[in-house]
């Protein structure tokens, strides 16, 4: 490879990569170009040379894709929170289906060439869909700013009007920044070793319009005045909490969360039932598409009244509780104590007596349940982006529940895990759901059915 940094080269884009970048070949060398689209002929400048590929910056487009659109966001190229806003939305959906195909081709689970990968289910109005805002804070020119860090940098992009963020959550964080200035509240800066407010989280219930606000701080700060002003200005705010995180790691939250004002949880609805959300509990970022995602999961698992169901990575119990009136029993686990408290509370509020929730890692709790005699016939897993733990995979291959649905937020770890799972299960179909329009991320529901004959035996 004779390419060098700052060298300018012509390139034809052959496809798009998993991060939404354009991919082409220059003299057999793989070139990644953010912002370029499939089919375009461009001129780019090399920014980084690696062992077997190079990265480049888009300079000019000589032949433009007919699917290229002007991004509506004025800070799109600077922010990095969205990666494919320059691609027409219907083609974004095609791209996300292709992401699944790319991941499967890379990991090659048995029979992947014939998997039924269904068209991505998109949104009619793919704007302002994020019900949860999580912005970092810094001080610039004497004023507090909140936003996202530019990719691979420590530069915070000030965001005043995010086009994918719920409008009320954006208004609240803008007001919070003003009040942090007015009350002279210290703001975190790792380079200057300043302690203070480092992250602002705002979450809104789509069903009730109730809002939670969390200040993540590296030290105790006096928020009394800010809380008084905010709750007077925004009656939708029902909870204000503080989370303490003094670590220098990239983790957003620390272990300790305290309610400073208001109620300890807000109410949300999905599939016609209501449930509680405490500040630290996980819930999907896009409530509208969550309805679609959970409906797809219900259809795929196809439970009966005799089934015993495990809801792994259960969060507040929202998926498992959608099945509770259709099965004999539901068990779930999560590593966040507040989530398990919420799950138990939600089950009780709905009047279910056939549910059980336990705090712990799925890879530890599920083997214990099987050894204790709980024979699950159905399983739904909704793991984090890291996918299924190896210990959990071994457990599933050993005990082999008859039905399984895998809800994935990372196509790469999904494809990796399927390499093991297809030793026991057949992939009936994969349904992609667009939970994050204008980004390179997608969600997928995989229906897995136990093979009639397989090489793995129960132990």
UniProtKB/Swiss-Prot annotation:
S-adenosyl-L-methionine binds at residues 284, 313, 334, 382. It holds the Pfam family tRNA_U5-meth_tr. PROSITE patterns: SAM_MT_RNA_M5U (PS51687), TRAM (PS50926), TRMA_1 (PS01230), TRMA_2 (PS01231). The keyword Transferase applies. GO terms for molecular function: 4 iron, 4 sulfur cluster binding; metal ion binding; rRNA (uridine-C5-)-methyltransferase activity. Transmembrane segments: none annotated. It is an enzyme of class 2 (transferase). SUPFAM superfamilies: Nucleic acid-binding proteins, S-adenosyl-L-methionine-dependent methyltransferases. Its EC number is 2.1.1.-. [4Fe-4S] cluster binds at residues 73, 79, 82, 162. GO terms for biological process: rRNA base methylation. Gene3D superfamilies: 2.40.50.1070, Nucleic acid-binding proteins, Vaccinia Virus protein VP39. Belongs to the class I-like SAM-binding methyltransferase superfamily. RNA M5U methyltransferase family. This is Uncharacterized RNA methyltransferase SMU_1779c. It comes from Streptococcus mutans serotype c (strain ATCC 700610 / UA159).
């Amino acid at each position: 490879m004779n390419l060098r940094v700052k060298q300018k080269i012509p390139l034809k884009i052959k496809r798009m990569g998993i991060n939404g970048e354009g991919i082409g070949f220059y003299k057999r060398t793989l070139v990644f170009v953010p912002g370029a689209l499939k089919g375009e002929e461009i001129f780019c400048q090399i920014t980084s040379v690696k062992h077997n590929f190079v990265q480049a910056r888009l300079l000019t487009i000589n032949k433009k894709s007919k699917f290229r659109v002007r991004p509506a966001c004025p800070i799109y190229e600077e922010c990095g929170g969205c990666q494919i806003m320059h691609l027409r939305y219907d083609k974004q959906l095609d791209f996300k289906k292709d992401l699944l195909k790319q991941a499967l081709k890379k990991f090659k689970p048995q029979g992947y060439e014939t998997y039924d990968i269904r068209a991505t289910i998109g949104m009619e109005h793919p704007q302002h869909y994020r019900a949860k805002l999580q912005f970092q804070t810094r001080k610039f020119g004497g004023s507090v700013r909140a936003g996202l860090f530019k990719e691979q940098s420590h530069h915070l992009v000030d965001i005043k009007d995010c086009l994918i963020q719920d409008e009320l959550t954006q208004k609240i964080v803008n007001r919070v920044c003003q009040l942090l200035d007015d009350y002279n509240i210290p703001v975190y800066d790792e380079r200057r070793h300043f302690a203070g407010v480092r992250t602002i989280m705002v979450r809104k219930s789509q069903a009730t319009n109730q809002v939670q606000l969390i200040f993540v701080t590296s030290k105790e700060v006096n928020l009394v005045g800010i809380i008084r002003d905010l709750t007077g200005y925004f009656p939708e705010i029902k909870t204000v909490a503080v989370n303490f995180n003094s670590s220098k790691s990239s983790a957003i939250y620390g272990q300790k969360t305290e309610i400073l004002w208001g109620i300890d949880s807000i109410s949300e609805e999905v599939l016609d039932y209501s449930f509680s959300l405490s500040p630290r509990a996980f819930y999907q970022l896009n409530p509208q598409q969550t309805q679609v995602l959970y409906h797809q999961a219900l259809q795929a698992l196809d439970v009966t009244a005799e089934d015993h169901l495990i809801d792994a990575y259960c969060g507040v119990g929202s998926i498992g509780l959608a099945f509770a009136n259709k099965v004999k029993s539901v068990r779930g686990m999560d590593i966040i104590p507040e989530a398990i408290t919420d799950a138990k509370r939600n089950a009780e509020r709905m009047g279910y007596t056939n549910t059980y929730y336990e705090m712990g890692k799925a890879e530890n709790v599920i083997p214990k349940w099987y050894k204790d005699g709980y024979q699950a016939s159905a399983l739904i897993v909704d793991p984090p982006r890291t996918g299924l733990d190896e210990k959990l995979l071994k457990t599933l291959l050993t005990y082999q529940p008859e039905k399984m649905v895998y809800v994935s937020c990372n196509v790469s770890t999904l494809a990796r895990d399927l390499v093991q799972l297809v030793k026991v299960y057949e992939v009936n179909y994969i349904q992609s759901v667009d939970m994050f329009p204008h980004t390179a991320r997608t969600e997928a529901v995989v229906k897995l059915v136990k093979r009639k004959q397989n090489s793995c035996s129960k132990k």
